[in-house]
């Protein structure tokens, strides 16, 4: 049976977002939401017919909120809003981000507080399910009043305007609708505002980044475990007794992950008089990785709330009361997404340091730069440079966006969140850190092969090593390889969900204890 996810505004999960955004799973509006949506719309119709003054329905927008709009102009007002607010810059957002945006906006609207017609929500849903993906520039949002510019670009194709992708081809909005067999719509009172006023873009990008960060945390534990086996790491820093007396959840989970990955390994050791303890990048993996786990668990808890929230303005209450408030403001997510970037940056930073330990012959006791006949061959020399470059770039990107604000709209919107910038930066940091962790896994596998043909790895690390070596070759000499290709293969291998799934079938990995 084909899977379909019901959208009720209450129960959407981050896993659902991934399924719809990346796997093309279909979705539908839950029957339980229909009554609330219709009731909310009736209230808006009454407002227009009664000529009541309500922001964004019978008034202008932003600092123009005191300009009254006649009932006969309320429809034109909404289309004008979309045409002028679609003012983004930069490259288009990737398909998974656009699909996540469409999904989260629909899920917010079906809660029944936005005064939008059911048919209009269904039109956006039809675009999503039929694979019409609006062209949305990545830049241009202040994260308050919501993500106005990018969401306006999302709406344009619904009106037969703008641009959209359909089956991989960039078309005019109308062409995309025609090829998909979708009719365009006209907006009714308040609908333009309901579609674009909210934290949807920053939340969608941040949700994808958060999900990927959780996978990266597990991969970083695996990378650290492999590096420990290269260095014959001392096992006592991972004993449960050490961590129960400082019961930070992420720290406890990391120590357990390492123990699980190393089960049965012949490449670890115990402390001796000649070797009392390992360096921080090995010994303190639970404390370093664990701190990032706790941070990202917090971010996920905020994402779980936001993807099921109403971030519109004004809000149409079920009793007919209309509230002009600030739920569109991105600050509640801007700070967590800055935190997300910092947490991921630390993972890349410590992984790069372990790459350095692997390629440094004085620290690894292996040939310089993990290649036979160093000098004639340079091996992993510049690979470590590249990781250092990414780690340093992350440190710049990790500067918080949410500490900045520029007043806008004639100082009516005088404090903004920059939350969309925070989410986008977090995703860039994630991509950089993913490359670094992939390189650590590749370097650790190379080092293990240089040490011995009989690895006797742990239960989890052996599964990872065997899978990795099916795709990524041992580097014998510089002459016969282009290391760039092998690095790309390494990233592709660990990006494939089946890689981590196979490891987790062998051993349990978690981010919280």
Curated annotation (Swiss-Prot):
Pfam families: Lyase_aromatic
InterPro entries: Aromatic_Lyase (IPR001106), Fumarase/histidase_N (IPR024083), HutH (IPR005921), L-Aspartase-like (IPR008948), Phe/His_NH3-lyase_AS (IPR022313)
GO term, biological process aspect, one: L-histidine catabolic process to glutamate and formate
Keywords from the named record: Cytoplasm, Histidine metabolism, Lyase
Modification 2,3-didehydroalanine (Ser) occurs at: 145
Places the protein is found: Cytoplasm
Coiled coil stretches, renumbered: none
The reaction(s) this protein catalyses: L-histidine = trans-urocanate + NH4(+)
EC class (word): lyase
Pathway: Amino-acid degradation; L-histidine degradation into L-glutamate; N-formimidoyl-L-glutamate from L-histidine: step 1/3
A single GO molecular function term of this UniProt record: histidine ammonia-lyase activity
Annotated crosslink 5-imidazolinone (Ala-Gly) location: 144-146
EC number, as in UniProt: 4.3.1.3
GO cellular component, one term: cytoplasm
Entry comment on modification after translation: Contains an active site 4-methylidene-imidazol-5-one (MIO), which is formed autocatalytically by cyclization and dehydration of residues Ala-Ser-Gly.
Homology family: Belongs to the PAL/histidase family.
Protein name: Histidine ammonia-lyase
Organism: Streptococcus pyogenes serotype M3 (strain ATCC BAA-595 / MGAS315)
Gene that specifies this protein: hutH
């Amino acid at each position: 049976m084909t899977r379909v996810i019901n959208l009720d505004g209450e129960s959407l999960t981050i896993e659902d977002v991934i399924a719809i955004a990346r796997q093309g799973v279909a979705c539908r509006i839950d029957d339980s939401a229909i009554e609330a949506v219709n009731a909310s719309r009736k209230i808006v119709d009454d407002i227009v017919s009664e000529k009541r003054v309500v922001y964004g329905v019978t008034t202008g927008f932003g600092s123009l909120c005191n300009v009254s709009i006649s009932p006969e102009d309320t429809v034109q007002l909404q289309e004008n809003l979309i045409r002028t607010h679609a003012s983004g810059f930069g490259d288009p957002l990737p398909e998974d981000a656009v699909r996540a945006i469409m999904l989260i906006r629909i899920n917010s609207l079906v809660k029944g507080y936005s005064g939008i017609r059911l048919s209009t929500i269904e039109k956006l849903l039809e675009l999503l399910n039929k694979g019409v993906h609006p062209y949305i520039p990545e830049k241009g949002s202040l994260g308050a009043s919501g993500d106005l510019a990018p969401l306006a670009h999302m709406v344009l194709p619904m009106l037969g305007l703008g641009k959209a992708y359909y089956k991989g081809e960039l078309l005019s909005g109308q062409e995309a609708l025609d090829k998909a067999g979708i009719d365009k719509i006209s907006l009714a009172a308040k609908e333009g505002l309901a579609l674009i006023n909210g934290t949807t873009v920053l939340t969608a990008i941040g949700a994808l980044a958060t999900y990927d960060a959780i996978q990266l945390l597990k991969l970083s534990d695996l990378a650290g475990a492999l590096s420990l086996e290269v260095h014959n790491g001392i096992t006592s820093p991972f004993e449960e007794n050490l961590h129960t007396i400082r019961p930070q959840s992420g720290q406890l989970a990391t120590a357990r992950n390492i123990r699980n990955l190393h089960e049965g390994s012949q490449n670890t050791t115990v402390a001796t008089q000649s070797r009392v303890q390992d360096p921080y990048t090995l010994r303190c993996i639970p404390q370093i990785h664990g701190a990032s786990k706790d941070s990202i668990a917090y971010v996920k808890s905020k994402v779980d709330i936001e993807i099921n929230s109403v971030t519109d303005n004004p809000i149409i209450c079920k009793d007919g009361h209309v509230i002009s408030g600030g739920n569109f403001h991105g600050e509640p997510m801007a700070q967590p997404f800055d935190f997300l970037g910092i947490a991921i940056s630390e993972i890349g930073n410590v992984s790069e340091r372990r790459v350095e330990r692997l390629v440094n012959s004085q620290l690894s006791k292996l040939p310089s730069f993990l290649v036979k006949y160093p000098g004639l061959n340079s091996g992993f020399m510049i690979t470590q440079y590249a990781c250092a470059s990414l780690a340093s770039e992350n440190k710049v990107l990790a500067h918080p966006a949410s500490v900045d604000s520029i007043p806008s709209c004639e100082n009516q919107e005088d404090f903004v969140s920059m939350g969309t910038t925070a989410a986008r930066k977090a995703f860039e940091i994630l991509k950089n850190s993913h490359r670094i962790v992939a390189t650590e896994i590749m370097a650790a596998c190379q080092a293990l092969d240089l040490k011995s043909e009989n690895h006797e790895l742990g239960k989890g690390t052996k599964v990872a090593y065997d899978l990795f070596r099916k795709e990524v070759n041992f580097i014998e000499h510089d002459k016969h390889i282009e290391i760039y290709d092998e690095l790309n293969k390494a990233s592709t291998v660990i990006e494939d969900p089946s890689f981590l799934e196979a490891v987790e079938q062998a051993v349990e990995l978690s981010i919280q204890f």
